[in-house]
Amino acid sequence: MFLSLDIRDYNAAAITVLKNQGNVLPVKGLDKRISVVTLGTTSSKNAFTETCRLYTDVDVYAMTEANMTSTLGKLKGSSKVIVGIYDKGAAYENCLNKLVLTVGSENVIPVFFVKPYDIGGFSGPISLCNTAIVAYENHEYAQEYAAQVVFGGSDATGRMPVSVEGVSFCGDGIDLYASRLGYGMVEEVGLDSEFLQQVDSLANLGVQKGAFPGCQVLVARHNKIVVNKSYGYTDKTKANKIDGNTLYDLASVSKATGTLSGIMKAVDDGLISIDGKLGTYTKSLAGTEKGKFLIRDLLYHETGMPAALNVYEEMTDTASYTGALVSAKKSAAYKYSAGGAYINSTAKVRSDVTSPVKTKEFDYRIGKRLYVGRETYDTIMNIIHNIPLRDNRRYLYSCLNFCLLMEAEENVTKVRHDKYVYDNIFHRLGAYRTVYRPLDFYKKSEIAPTEYDGYFREEVVQGSVHDETAAFSGGIQGNAGLFSNANDLAKLCQMWLNRGMYGGEQILSSDVVNTFVTSKSPNSHRGLGYDKPNLAKPEWSSTCEEAGPTVFGHTGFTGTCFWVDPENDMIYIFLCNRVYPSRNNKAFTEVGARAGIMKALYQAVERNN
Protein backbone atom coordinates (compact mmCIF):
# COMPACT_ATOMS: atom_id res chain seq x y z
CA MET A 1 0.00 0.00 0.00
CA PHE A 2 2.67 2.50 1.06
CA LEU A 3 4.98 1.49 -1.79
CA SER A 4 2.12 2.29 -4.15
CA LEU A 5 1.65 5.62 -2.36
CA ASP A 6 5.37 6.40 -2.78
CA ILE A 7 5.21 5.67 -6.51
CA ARG A 8 2.15 7.89 -6.83
CA ASP A 9 3.88 10.69 -4.92
CA TYR A 10 6.91 10.40 -7.20
CA ASN A 11 4.80 10.69 -10.35
CA ALA A 12 2.75 13.55 -8.95
CA ALA A 13 5.84 15.49 -7.87
CA ALA A 14 7.52 15.05 -11.25
CA ILE A 15 4.78 16.64 -13.39
CA THR A 16 6.25 19.82 -14.86
CA VAL A 17 4.35 22.74 -16.35
CA LEU A 18 6.72 24.28 -18.89
CA LYS A 19 4.40 26.97 -20.25
CA ASN A 20 1.18 28.58 -19.08
CA GLN A 21 0.74 31.80 -21.01
CA GLY A 22 -2.54 33.53 -20.24
CA ASN A 23 -3.11 31.22 -17.26
CA VAL A 24 -4.87 28.69 -19.46
CA LEU A 25 -4.13 26.05 -16.83
CA PRO A 26 -5.95 24.68 -14.99
CA VAL A 27 -8.54 24.41 -17.75
CA LYS A 28 -11.59 26.59 -17.17
CA GLY A 29 -14.87 26.85 -19.04
CA LEU A 30 -16.06 23.29 -18.53
CA ASP A 31 -19.44 24.37 -19.88
CA LYS A 32 -17.81 24.52 -23.33
CA ARG A 33 -16.74 21.64 -25.57
CA ILE A 34 -13.40 20.06 -24.64
CA SER A 35 -11.66 17.35 -26.66
CA VAL A 36 -8.80 14.97 -25.84
CA VAL A 37 -6.49 13.63 -28.56
CA THR A 38 -4.01 10.77 -28.25
CA LEU A 39 -0.80 10.72 -30.34
CA GLY A 40 1.56 7.75 -30.39
CA THR A 41 -0.98 5.14 -29.38
CA THR A 42 -3.81 3.51 -31.28
CA SER A 43 -6.06 3.44 -28.22
CA SER A 44 -8.30 6.33 -27.26
CA LYS A 45 -8.80 4.90 -23.78
CA ASN A 46 -6.12 4.96 -21.09
CA ALA A 47 -5.56 6.36 -17.60
CA PHE A 48 -5.05 9.87 -18.99
CA THR A 49 -8.25 10.01 -21.05
CA GLU A 50 -10.31 8.29 -18.35
CA THR A 51 -9.08 10.70 -15.67
CA CYS A 52 -9.97 13.61 -17.95
CA ARG A 53 -13.49 12.16 -18.15
CA LEU A 54 -13.77 12.37 -14.36
CA TYR A 55 -13.55 16.15 -14.61
CA THR A 56 -15.95 16.87 -17.44
CA ASP A 57 -17.58 15.54 -20.59
CA VAL A 58 -14.83 15.15 -23.20
CA ASP A 59 -14.70 13.84 -26.76
CA VAL A 60 -11.68 11.54 -27.25
CA TYR A 61 -9.90 10.83 -30.55
CA ALA A 62 -6.88 8.67 -31.42
CA MET A 63 -5.06 10.70 -34.07
CA THR A 64 -2.65 9.33 -36.69
CA GLU A 65 -1.21 10.69 -39.92
CA ALA A 66 -3.71 8.50 -41.76
CA ASN A 67 -6.79 9.94 -40.06
CA MET A 68 -5.38 13.41 -39.39
CA THR A 69 -7.66 15.27 -41.81
CA SER A 70 -10.85 13.66 -40.56
CA THR A 71 -9.82 14.09 -36.91
CA LEU A 72 -9.05 17.77 -37.41
CA GLY A 73 -12.53 18.18 -38.86
CA LYS A 74 -14.08 16.58 -35.80
CA LEU A 75 -12.18 18.94 -33.50
CA LYS A 76 -13.83 22.05 -34.94
CA GLY A 77 -15.86 23.79 -32.27
CA SER A 78 -13.68 22.59 -29.40
CA SER A 79 -12.78 25.35 -26.95
CA LYS A 80 -9.76 23.36 -25.77
CA VAL A 81 -7.93 20.35 -27.21
CA ILE A 82 -5.81 18.40 -24.74
CA VAL A 83 -3.20 16.29 -26.53
CA GLY A 84 -1.55 13.29 -24.88
CA ILE A 85 1.73 12.45 -26.66
CA TYR A 86 2.99 8.94 -25.89
CA ASP A 87 5.85 8.46 -28.37
CA LYS A 88 8.50 10.42 -30.27
CA GLY A 89 8.83 10.72 -34.01
CA ALA A 90 8.43 13.08 -36.94
CA ALA A 91 4.95 11.75 -37.69
CA TYR A 92 3.67 12.75 -34.27
CA GLU A 93 5.37 16.14 -34.44
CA ASN A 94 3.68 16.73 -37.79
CA CYS A 95 0.28 15.80 -36.33
CA LEU A 96 0.76 18.11 -33.35
CA ASN A 97 1.96 20.94 -35.58
CA LYS A 98 -1.08 20.63 -37.88
CA LEU A 99 -3.35 20.45 -34.86
CA VAL A 100 -1.92 23.67 -33.39
CA LEU A 101 -2.20 25.50 -36.71
CA THR A 102 -5.79 24.32 -37.22
CA VAL A 103 -7.25 24.69 -33.71
CA GLY A 104 -5.14 27.63 -32.53
CA SER A 105 -2.08 27.86 -30.29
CA GLU A 106 -4.10 29.19 -27.36
CA ASN A 107 -6.50 26.24 -27.51
CA VAL A 108 -4.07 23.29 -27.63
CA ILE A 109 -2.62 21.81 -24.43
CA PRO A 110 0.16 19.28 -25.21
CA VAL A 111 1.02 16.77 -22.46
CA PHE A 112 4.17 14.67 -23.02
CA PHE A 113 4.54 11.12 -21.71
CA VAL A 114 8.07 10.70 -23.11
CA LYS A 115 11.62 11.08 -21.81
CA PRO A 116 12.91 14.67 -21.41
CA TYR A 117 15.30 14.60 -24.37
CA ASP A 118 12.58 13.20 -26.65
CA ILE A 119 10.60 16.40 -26.19
CA GLY A 120 13.18 18.21 -28.32
CA GLY A 121 11.64 16.73 -31.43
CA PHE A 122 8.49 18.73 -30.71
CA SER A 123 10.21 22.10 -30.26
CA GLY A 124 8.33 23.64 -33.21
CA PRO A 125 4.76 23.10 -32.01
CA ILE A 126 5.78 23.70 -28.38
CA SER A 127 7.05 27.15 -29.35
CA LEU A 128 3.63 27.93 -30.82
CA CYS A 129 1.54 26.69 -27.88
CA ASN A 130 0.57 28.76 -24.86
CA THR A 131 0.90 25.71 -22.64
CA ALA A 132 3.02 22.57 -22.30
CA ILE A 133 3.17 19.85 -19.63
CA VAL A 134 5.80 17.13 -19.20
CA ALA A 135 4.99 13.88 -17.35
CA TYR A 136 8.24 12.11 -18.42
CA GLU A 137 6.98 8.52 -18.70
CA ASN A 138 4.13 6.56 -20.20
CA HIS A 139 2.92 5.11 -16.91
CA GLU A 140 -0.57 4.80 -15.43
CA TYR A 141 0.18 7.06 -12.45
CA ALA A 142 1.93 9.65 -14.62
CA GLN A 143 -1.13 9.72 -16.86
CA GLU A 144 -3.54 10.06 -13.92
CA TYR A 145 -1.67 12.94 -12.30
CA ALA A 146 -1.01 14.74 -15.58
CA ALA A 147 -4.76 14.82 -16.22
CA GLN A 148 -5.31 16.06 -12.68
CA VAL A 149 -2.84 18.89 -13.26
CA VAL A 150 -4.59 19.86 -16.52
CA PHE A 151 -7.90 20.23 -14.68
CA GLY A 152 -6.57 21.59 -11.39
CA GLY A 153 -6.96 18.45 -9.29
CA SER A 154 -3.31 18.30 -8.28
CA ASP A 155 -0.46 20.72 -7.64
CA ALA A 156 2.36 20.86 -10.18
CA THR A 157 5.75 21.82 -8.75
CA GLY A 158 8.08 19.74 -10.94
CA ARG A 159 11.19 21.08 -12.66
CA MET A 160 12.97 19.96 -15.83
CA PRO A 161 15.86 17.66 -14.83
CA VAL A 162 17.86 18.52 -17.96
CA SER A 163 18.13 21.20 -20.61
CA VAL A 164 16.44 20.42 -23.91
CA GLU A 165 17.58 22.49 -26.88
CA GLY A 166 14.85 24.72 -28.23
CA VAL A 167 12.46 23.79 -25.43
CA SER A 168 13.75 24.48 -21.92
CA PHE A 169 16.64 24.80 -19.52
CA CYS A 170 17.37 22.52 -16.59
CA GLY A 171 15.31 23.69 -13.62
CA ASP A 172 12.54 25.24 -15.70
CA GLY A 173 8.99 24.79 -14.45
CA ILE A 174 5.95 26.77 -13.32
CA ASP A 175 4.11 26.11 -10.08
CA LEU A 176 0.42 25.35 -10.43
CA TYR A 177 -1.96 24.73 -7.54
CA ALA A 178 -5.06 22.60 -7.17
CA SER A 179 -8.44 24.26 -7.63
CA ARG A 180 -10.66 21.22 -8.17
CA LEU A 181 -11.03 17.84 -6.51
CA GLY A 182 -8.09 15.52 -6.99
CA TYR A 183 -7.87 11.74 -6.71
CA GLY A 184 -5.60 10.02 -4.23
CA MET A 185 -5.31 7.42 -1.50
CA VAL A 186 -6.81 7.30 1.99
CA GLU A 187 -3.42 7.60 3.71
CA GLU A 188 -2.94 11.03 2.13
CA VAL A 189 -5.89 12.49 4.05
CA GLY A 190 -5.61 10.89 7.49
CA LEU A 191 -7.64 7.74 6.86
CA ASP A 192 -6.45 4.12 6.66
CA SER A 193 -6.78 0.72 5.01
CA GLU A 194 -8.95 -0.51 7.89
CA PHE A 195 -11.59 1.99 6.79
CA LEU A 196 -11.40 0.71 3.20
CA GLN A 197 -11.97 -2.82 4.48
CA GLN A 198 -15.04 -1.64 6.41
CA VAL A 199 -16.43 0.06 3.29
CA ASP A 200 -15.94 -3.12 1.27
CA SER A 201 -17.47 -5.26 4.01
CA LEU A 202 -20.62 -3.17 4.45
CA ALA A 203 -21.20 -2.55 0.74
CA ASN A 204 -20.69 -6.21 -0.17
CA LEU A 205 -22.91 -7.30 2.71
CA GLY A 206 -25.66 -5.03 1.39
CA VAL A 207 -25.43 -6.66 -2.03
CA GLN A 208 -25.33 -10.20 -0.58
CA LYS A 209 -28.33 -9.62 1.71
CA GLY A 210 -30.44 -7.98 -0.98
CA ALA A 211 -30.43 -4.53 0.64
CA PHE A 212 -29.60 -3.21 -2.83
CA PRO A 213 -28.35 -4.82 -6.07
CA GLY A 214 -25.40 -2.42 -6.20
CA CYS A 215 -24.08 0.90 -4.93
CA GLN A 216 -21.51 3.67 -5.26
CA VAL A 217 -19.50 4.94 -2.29
CA LEU A 218 -17.41 8.12 -2.35
CA VAL A 219 -15.32 9.80 0.31
CA ALA A 220 -13.38 13.02 -0.21
CA ARG A 221 -11.25 14.86 2.30
CA HIS A 222 -8.88 17.81 2.06
CA ASN A 223 -9.83 18.34 -1.61
CA LYS A 224 -9.06 14.72 -2.60
CA ILE A 225 -11.41 11.90 -3.54
CA VAL A 226 -9.85 8.89 -1.83
CA VAL A 227 -12.74 6.41 -2.08
CA ASN A 228 -14.71 6.17 -5.32
CA LYS A 229 -15.88 2.59 -5.47
CA SER A 230 -18.70 0.67 -7.10
CA TYR A 231 -20.24 -2.60 -5.98
CA GLY A 232 -22.68 -5.12 -7.44
CA TYR A 233 -25.00 -4.76 -10.41
CA THR A 234 -27.83 -2.52 -11.56
CA ASP A 235 -30.43 -5.29 -11.12
CA LYS A 236 -30.94 -8.98 -10.36
CA THR A 237 -30.12 -10.07 -13.92
CA LYS A 238 -26.49 -9.06 -13.28
CA ALA A 239 -26.21 -7.97 -16.90
CA ASN A 240 -24.71 -4.57 -16.04
CA LYS A 241 -22.09 -4.05 -13.37
CA ILE A 242 -22.18 -0.84 -11.39
CA ASP A 243 -19.31 1.46 -12.33
CA GLY A 244 -18.48 5.08 -11.68
CA ASN A 245 -20.66 6.21 -14.59
CA THR A 246 -23.85 4.47 -13.44
CA LEU A 247 -26.64 6.98 -12.87
CA TYR A 248 -28.89 6.73 -9.82
CA ASP A 249 -32.30 8.25 -9.16
CA LEU A 250 -31.44 10.65 -6.33
CA ALA A 251 -35.04 10.89 -5.04
CA SER A 252 -35.18 13.63 -2.35
CA VAL A 253 -31.46 14.28 -2.63
CA SER A 254 -32.73 16.22 -5.68
CA LYS A 255 -34.15 18.81 -3.29
CA ALA A 256 -30.77 19.76 -1.86
CA THR A 257 -28.80 19.39 -5.09
CA GLY A 258 -31.13 20.35 -7.95
CA THR A 259 -33.81 22.63 -6.52
CA LEU A 260 -31.55 24.21 -3.93
CA SER A 261 -28.92 24.95 -6.59
CA GLY A 262 -31.54 26.86 -8.56
CA ILE A 263 -32.78 28.76 -5.52
CA MET A 264 -29.24 29.66 -4.42
CA LYS A 265 -28.43 31.00 -7.88
CA ALA A 266 -31.68 32.99 -8.01
CA VAL A 267 -30.89 34.45 -4.57
CA ASP A 268 -27.34 35.22 -5.73
CA ASP A 269 -28.71 37.08 -8.75
CA GLY A 270 -31.13 39.10 -6.61
CA LEU A 271 -34.20 37.46 -8.15
CA ILE A 272 -35.36 35.85 -4.90
CA SER A 273 -34.90 36.73 -1.24
CA ILE A 274 -35.06 34.01 1.41
CA ASP A 275 -37.17 36.43 3.44
CA GLY A 276 -39.43 37.25 0.50
CA LYS A 277 -43.02 36.01 0.34
CA LEU A 278 -43.93 33.21 -2.04
CA GLY A 279 -46.76 35.32 -3.47
CA THR A 280 -44.18 37.84 -4.67
CA TYR A 281 -42.71 35.22 -7.00
CA THR A 282 -45.81 33.14 -7.78
CA LYS A 283 -48.47 35.74 -8.55
CA SER A 284 -51.33 33.24 -8.60
CA LEU A 285 -50.73 32.68 -4.87
CA ALA A 286 -50.63 36.38 -3.94
CA GLY A 287 -53.28 37.13 -1.34
CA THR A 288 -53.60 33.48 -0.26
CA GLU A 289 -52.29 31.78 2.87
CA LYS A 290 -49.66 29.99 0.81
CA GLY A 291 -48.64 33.29 -0.73
CA LYS A 292 -47.65 34.46 2.76
CA PHE A 293 -45.04 31.70 3.12
CA LEU A 294 -41.51 33.05 3.30
CA ILE A 295 -38.97 31.29 1.09
CA ARG A 296 -37.15 30.57 4.34
CA ASP A 297 -40.27 28.79 5.69
CA LEU A 298 -40.38 26.53 2.64
CA LEU A 299 -36.68 25.69 2.98
CA TYR A 300 -37.11 24.88 6.69
CA HIS A 301 -40.33 22.89 6.05
CA GLU A 302 -42.31 25.13 8.39
CA THR A 303 -45.35 25.95 6.27
CA GLY A 304 -48.16 23.68 7.38
CA MET A 305 -48.13 21.91 4.00
CA PRO A 306 -48.95 18.18 4.13
CA ALA A 307 -46.04 15.78 3.63
CA ALA A 308 -46.91 14.78 0.06
CA LEU A 309 -49.58 14.37 -2.59
CA ASN A 310 -51.57 11.16 -2.77
CA VAL A 311 -50.85 10.78 -6.46
CA TYR A 312 -52.72 7.48 -6.70
CA GLU A 313 -55.94 9.24 -5.71
CA GLU A 314 -55.27 12.40 -7.70
CA MET A 315 -54.33 10.66 -10.95
CA THR A 316 -56.93 7.87 -10.89
CA ASP A 317 -60.32 8.30 -12.57
CA THR A 318 -62.75 8.15 -9.63
CA ALA A 319 -65.52 6.85 -11.91
CA SER A 320 -63.47 3.79 -12.86
CA TYR A 321 -63.75 1.90 -9.57
CA THR A 322 -65.93 1.30 -6.52
CA GLY A 323 -64.85 0.69 -2.96
CA ALA A 324 -61.41 1.60 -1.65
CA LEU A 325 -58.68 2.46 -4.15
CA VAL A 326 -55.84 0.84 -2.19
CA SER A 327 -55.47 -2.34 -0.15
CA ALA A 328 -52.56 -3.61 1.90
CA LYS A 329 -53.26 -7.16 0.70
CA LYS A 330 -53.24 -8.62 -2.80
CA SER A 331 -56.47 -10.20 -4.04
CA ALA A 332 -58.51 -10.57 -7.21
CA ALA A 333 -60.09 -7.20 -6.41
CA TYR A 334 -56.69 -5.59 -5.74
CA LYS A 335 -54.12 -7.02 -8.10
CA TYR A 336 -51.95 -4.09 -9.21
CA SER A 337 -48.74 -3.80 -7.18
CA ALA A 338 -47.77 -0.16 -6.71
CA GLY A 339 -46.35 2.06 -4.00
CA GLY A 340 -45.85 -0.81 -1.60
CA ALA A 341 -49.56 -1.72 -1.71
CA TYR A 342 -52.21 -2.97 -4.16
CA ILE A 343 -54.56 -0.95 -6.37
CA ASN A 344 -58.20 -1.66 -7.14
CA SER A 345 -58.34 -3.98 -10.17
CA THR A 346 -60.87 -1.85 -12.07
CA ALA A 347 -59.10 1.47 -11.43
CA LYS A 348 -57.95 3.46 -14.46
CA VAL A 349 -55.53 6.35 -14.85
CA ARG A 350 -57.13 9.70 -15.63
CA SER A 351 -57.44 10.14 -19.39
CA ASP A 352 -58.07 13.90 -19.29
CA VAL A 353 -54.51 14.78 -18.25
CA THR A 354 -52.54 11.76 -19.55
CA SER A 355 -52.39 9.66 -22.70
CA PRO A 356 -51.65 5.96 -23.36
CA VAL A 357 -49.72 6.98 -26.49
CA LYS A 358 -47.34 9.80 -27.33
CA THR A 359 -49.08 12.92 -28.64
CA LYS A 360 -48.15 16.55 -29.18
CA GLU A 361 -49.74 17.48 -25.84
CA PHE A 362 -48.52 14.44 -23.90
CA ASP A 363 -45.02 13.75 -25.15
CA TYR A 364 -43.04 12.51 -22.13
CA ARG A 365 -43.12 8.78 -21.42
CA ILE A 366 -43.29 7.73 -17.76
CA GLY A 367 -44.74 4.23 -18.22
CA LYS A 368 -45.44 1.45 -20.68
CA ARG A 369 -48.71 3.08 -21.73
CA LEU A 370 -48.48 6.41 -19.95
CA TYR A 371 -47.47 9.79 -21.34
CA VAL A 372 -47.69 13.16 -19.60
CA GLY A 373 -47.27 16.77 -20.68
CA ARG A 374 -47.60 20.39 -19.63
CA GLU A 375 -51.26 19.95 -18.78
CA THR A 376 -50.35 17.14 -16.38
CA TYR A 377 -47.77 19.35 -14.66
CA ASP A 378 -50.24 22.23 -14.42
CA THR A 379 -52.79 19.87 -12.87
CA ILE A 380 -50.26 18.72 -10.25
CA MET A 381 -49.35 22.30 -9.37
CA ASN A 382 -53.01 23.35 -9.19
CA ILE A 383 -53.64 20.56 -6.69
CA ILE A 384 -50.66 21.74 -4.62
CA HIS A 385 -51.86 25.35 -4.77
CA ASN A 386 -55.27 24.35 -3.43
CA ILE A 387 -54.36 21.60 -0.99
CA PRO A 388 -55.59 22.30 2.57
CA LEU A 389 -52.99 23.32 5.13
CA ARG A 390 -52.50 21.68 8.49
CA ASP A 391 -53.69 23.59 11.55
CA ASN A 392 -50.15 24.56 12.58
CA ARG A 393 -46.86 25.47 10.97
CA ARG A 394 -44.56 23.36 13.10
CA TYR A 395 -41.81 21.50 11.27
CA LEU A 396 -43.07 18.75 8.98
CA TYR A 397 -40.93 17.58 6.09
CA SER A 398 -42.94 18.15 2.90
CA CYS A 399 -42.17 17.40 -0.73
CA LEU A 400 -44.69 20.06 -1.69
CA ASN A 401 -42.58 22.88 -0.24
CA PHE A 402 -39.91 22.16 -2.82
CA CYS A 403 -42.42 21.89 -5.65
CA LEU A 404 -43.46 25.44 -4.78
CA LEU A 405 -39.80 26.53 -4.61
CA MET A 406 -39.01 25.25 -8.11
CA GLU A 407 -42.11 26.95 -9.47
CA ALA A 408 -41.03 30.26 -7.90
CA GLU A 409 -37.54 29.88 -9.36
CA GLU A 410 -38.92 29.33 -12.87
CA ASN A 411 -41.27 32.29 -12.49
CA VAL A 412 -38.43 34.72 -11.74
CA THR A 413 -35.79 33.31 -14.09
CA LYS A 414 -38.16 32.71 -17.04
CA VAL A 415 -36.09 29.57 -17.73
CA ARG A 416 -37.07 25.94 -17.23
CA HIS A 417 -35.48 24.63 -14.06
CA ASP A 418 -33.31 21.92 -15.62
CA LYS A 419 -31.73 24.31 -18.14
CA TYR A 420 -31.20 26.93 -15.42
CA VAL A 421 -29.19 24.60 -13.17
CA TYR A 422 -27.34 22.99 -16.10
CA ASP A 423 -26.15 26.33 -17.44
CA ASN A 424 -25.41 28.06 -14.16
CA ILE A 425 -24.20 25.25 -11.90
CA PHE A 426 -23.75 21.69 -13.15
CA HIS A 427 -22.02 22.25 -16.49
CA ARG A 428 -19.70 24.85 -14.99
CA LEU A 429 -18.67 22.19 -12.46
CA GLY A 430 -18.16 19.62 -15.21
CA ALA A 431 -21.08 17.62 -13.78
CA TYR A 432 -22.56 16.48 -17.10
CA ARG A 433 -23.91 13.23 -15.69
CA THR A 434 -26.19 15.14 -13.32
CA VAL A 435 -29.43 15.36 -15.27
CA TYR A 436 -33.19 15.32 -15.24
CA ARG A 437 -34.85 12.99 -17.78
CA PRO A 438 -31.65 10.92 -18.16
CA LEU A 439 -32.88 8.94 -21.17
CA ASP A 440 -32.60 12.17 -23.17
CA PHE A 441 -28.82 11.92 -22.68
CA TYR A 442 -27.77 8.38 -21.75
CA LYS A 443 -28.52 4.75 -22.52
CA LYS A 444 -31.01 2.88 -20.37
CA SER A 445 -28.29 0.38 -19.43
CA GLU A 446 -26.31 3.19 -17.77
CA ILE A 447 -29.17 3.93 -15.34
CA ALA A 448 -29.98 1.87 -12.25
CA PRO A 449 -33.65 0.79 -12.19
CA THR A 450 -35.94 1.45 -9.24
CA GLU A 451 -39.31 -0.11 -8.47
CA TYR A 452 -41.76 -2.32 -10.31
CA ASP A 453 -45.04 -0.39 -10.65
CA GLY A 454 -47.89 -2.60 -11.80
CA TYR A 455 -50.47 0.20 -11.97
CA PHE A 456 -49.27 3.51 -13.38
CA ARG A 457 -46.11 2.37 -15.15
CA GLU A 458 -46.82 -1.34 -15.80
CA GLU A 459 -43.08 -2.01 -15.73
CA VAL A 460 -39.88 -1.66 -13.72
CA VAL A 461 -39.11 2.05 -13.64
CA GLN A 462 -35.76 2.75 -15.29
CA GLY A 463 -34.66 6.11 -16.61
CA SER A 464 -37.85 7.79 -15.45
CA VAL A 465 -38.07 9.26 -11.96
CA HIS A 466 -39.42 6.88 -9.31
CA ASP A 467 -41.33 9.53 -7.34
CA GLU A 468 -44.91 9.75 -8.61
CA THR A 469 -45.34 13.51 -8.11
CA ALA A 470 -42.18 14.22 -10.08
CA ALA A 471 -43.08 11.64 -12.74
CA PHE A 472 -46.52 13.14 -13.44
CA SER A 473 -44.85 16.56 -13.48
CA GLY A 474 -42.85 15.43 -16.50
CA GLY A 475 -39.70 14.27 -14.73
CA ILE A 476 -38.64 17.76 -13.65
CA GLN A 477 -39.96 18.78 -10.26
CA GLY A 478 -38.72 20.43 -7.10
CA ASN A 479 -39.09 17.41 -4.85
CA ALA A 480 -37.36 14.79 -7.05
CA GLY A 481 -36.26 13.99 -10.58
CA LEU A 482 -32.49 14.46 -10.60
CA PHE A 483 -30.18 11.58 -11.56
CA SER A 484 -26.44 11.57 -10.94
CA ASN A 485 -23.40 9.60 -9.88
CA ALA A 486 -21.18 9.97 -6.82
CA ASN A 487 -18.31 11.61 -8.71
CA ASP A 488 -20.51 14.43 -10.03
CA LEU A 489 -22.19 15.06 -6.68
CA ALA A 490 -18.77 15.41 -5.06
CA LYS A 491 -18.03 18.41 -7.31
CA LEU A 492 -21.16 20.17 -6.08
CA CYS A 493 -20.34 19.34 -2.46
CA GLN A 494 -16.75 20.58 -2.81
CA MET A 495 -18.00 23.82 -4.37
CA TRP A 496 -20.11 24.35 -1.24
CA LEU A 497 -17.12 23.56 0.97
CA ASN A 498 -15.12 26.13 -1.03
CA ARG A 499 -17.89 28.69 -0.42
CA GLY A 500 -18.91 28.82 -4.06
CA MET A 501 -15.47 28.59 -5.68
CA TYR A 502 -14.50 25.69 -7.94
CA GLY A 503 -11.90 25.37 -10.66
CA GLY A 504 -10.83 28.97 -10.19
CA GLU A 505 -14.36 30.21 -10.91
CA GLN A 506 -16.87 31.69 -8.47
CA ILE A 507 -19.94 29.57 -9.24
CA LEU A 508 -21.98 31.09 -6.41
CA SER A 509 -21.06 34.01 -4.16
CA SER A 510 -19.39 33.09 -0.88
CA ASP A 511 -22.00 35.05 1.10
CA VAL A 512 -24.93 33.14 -0.39
CA VAL A 513 -23.28 29.74 0.06
CA ASN A 514 -22.27 30.60 3.61
CA THR A 515 -25.84 31.62 4.47
CA PHE A 516 -27.32 28.39 3.15
CA VAL A 517 -24.78 25.91 4.54
CA THR A 518 -24.54 27.44 8.03
CA SER A 519 -28.14 28.41 8.78
CA LYS A 520 -30.28 26.25 11.04
CA SER A 521 -33.93 26.59 12.00
CA PRO A 522 -34.53 27.76 15.59
CA ASN A 523 -37.49 25.36 15.68
CA SER A 524 -35.98 22.11 14.39
CA HIS A 525 -32.73 20.44 13.35
CA ARG A 526 -33.21 21.42 9.68
CA GLY A 527 -30.99 23.71 7.66
CA LEU A 528 -31.92 26.00 4.77
CA GLY A 529 -32.91 23.27 2.33
CA TYR A 530 -30.48 20.80 3.85
CA ASP A 531 -30.97 18.13 6.46
CA LYS A 532 -28.65 18.25 9.47
CA PRO A 533 -27.83 15.93 12.38
CA ASN A 534 -30.61 15.75 14.97
CA LEU A 535 -28.41 16.40 17.99
CA ALA A 536 -31.37 16.57 20.38
CA LYS A 537 -32.66 13.15 19.29
CA PRO A 538 -29.74 11.27 17.70
CA GLU A 539 -31.84 8.12 17.32
CA TRP A 540 -34.01 10.05 14.83
CA SER A 541 -31.08 11.51 12.92
CA SER A 542 -30.41 10.67 9.28
CA THR A 543 -26.68 10.78 10.04
CA CYS A 544 -24.55 8.61 12.28
CA GLU A 545 -24.36 9.89 15.86
CA GLU A 546 -20.73 11.01 15.40
CA ALA A 547 -21.70 13.76 12.92
CA GLY A 548 -21.30 17.24 14.37
CA PRO A 549 -23.45 20.39 14.21
CA THR A 550 -21.77 21.83 11.09
CA VAL A 551 -22.66 18.80 8.95
CA PHE A 552 -25.26 19.30 6.21
CA GLY A 553 -26.68 17.05 3.51
CA HIS A 554 -29.75 15.03 2.57
CA THR A 555 -31.07 11.52 2.09
CA GLY A 556 -33.30 10.07 -0.62
CA PHE A 557 -36.02 7.41 -0.57
CA THR A 558 -34.24 5.31 -3.19
CA GLY A 559 -31.32 4.77 -0.78
CA THR A 560 -29.17 7.80 -1.57
CA CYS A 561 -27.40 10.38 0.57
CA PHE A 562 -24.67 12.98 0.68
CA TRP A 563 -23.15 14.57 3.78
CA VAL A 564 -20.70 17.46 3.92
CA ASP A 565 -18.64 18.11 7.05
CA PRO A 566 -16.89 21.51 6.99
CA GLU A 567 -15.22 20.92 10.36
CA ASN A 568 -13.45 17.78 9.15
CA ASP A 569 -13.20 19.03 5.54
CA MET A 570 -14.96 15.89 4.38
CA ILE A 571 -17.60 14.63 1.93
CA TYR A 572 -19.46 11.31 2.10
CA ILE A 573 -21.76 10.08 -0.69
CA PHE A 574 -23.70 6.82 -0.88
CA LEU A 575 -25.93 5.97 -3.84
CA CYS A 576 -28.00 2.83 -4.36
CA ASN A 577 -31.37 1.63 -5.65
CA ARG A 578 -32.72 -0.05 -2.52
CA VAL A 579 -36.32 0.20 -3.86
CA TYR A 580 -35.53 -2.30 -6.64
CA PRO A 581 -37.64 -4.28 -7.27
CA SER A 582 -39.86 -3.14 -4.36
CA ARG A 583 -39.79 -0.47 -1.65
CA ASN A 584 -40.77 -3.18 0.85
CA ASN A 585 -37.14 -3.96 1.59
CA LYS A 586 -36.34 -4.70 5.24
CA ALA A 587 -32.77 -5.72 4.38
CA PHE A 588 -31.76 -2.11 3.67
CA THR A 589 -32.54 -1.08 7.24
CA GLU A 590 -31.19 -4.30 8.73
CA VAL A 591 -27.81 -4.05 6.99
CA GLY A 592 -27.57 -0.29 7.59
CA ALA A 593 -24.77 0.24 5.08
CA ARG A 594 -25.62 3.88 4.31
CA ALA A 595 -25.21 5.08 7.90
CA GLY A 596 -22.74 2.33 8.80
CA ILE A 597 -20.12 3.49 6.30
CA MET A 598 -20.56 7.05 7.56
CA LYS A 599 -19.96 5.84 11.12
CA ALA A 600 -16.85 3.93 10.02
CA LEU A 601 -15.58 7.11 8.36
CA TYR A 602 -15.80 9.10 11.59
CA GLN A 603 -14.17 6.27 13.51
CA ALA A 604 -11.29 6.31 11.02
CA VAL A 605 -10.88 10.07 11.44
CA GLU A 606 -10.77 9.65 15.22
CA ARG A 607 -8.40 6.68 14.98
CA ASN A 608 -5.90 8.65 12.89
CA ASN A 609 -6.03 11.98 14.73
State where each predicted segment sits:
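Short, surface-exposed loop or secondary-structure junction motifs
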Residues: 291-549
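Preference for extracellular/luminal or secreted protein segments
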Residues: 1-188, 192
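Short, surface-exposed beta-strand/loop micro-motifs that present aromatic residues
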Residues: 551, 558-571
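Short, gly/Ser/Thr-rich active-site loops of penicillin-recognizing serine hydrolases
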Residues: 61-64, 161-170, 498, 502, ...
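Active-site SXXK
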Residues: 197-204, 217-218, 223, 246-275, ...
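Short, conserved catalytic-motif segment at the N-terminal edge
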Residues: 189-250, 271-276, 467, 583-584
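Short, glycine/proline-biased beta-turn/loop segments that scaffold the active-site neighborhood
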Residues: 273-289, 427-428
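Extracytoplasmic/secreted envelope proteins and their assembly/folding machinery
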Residues: 11, 15, 49, 147, ...
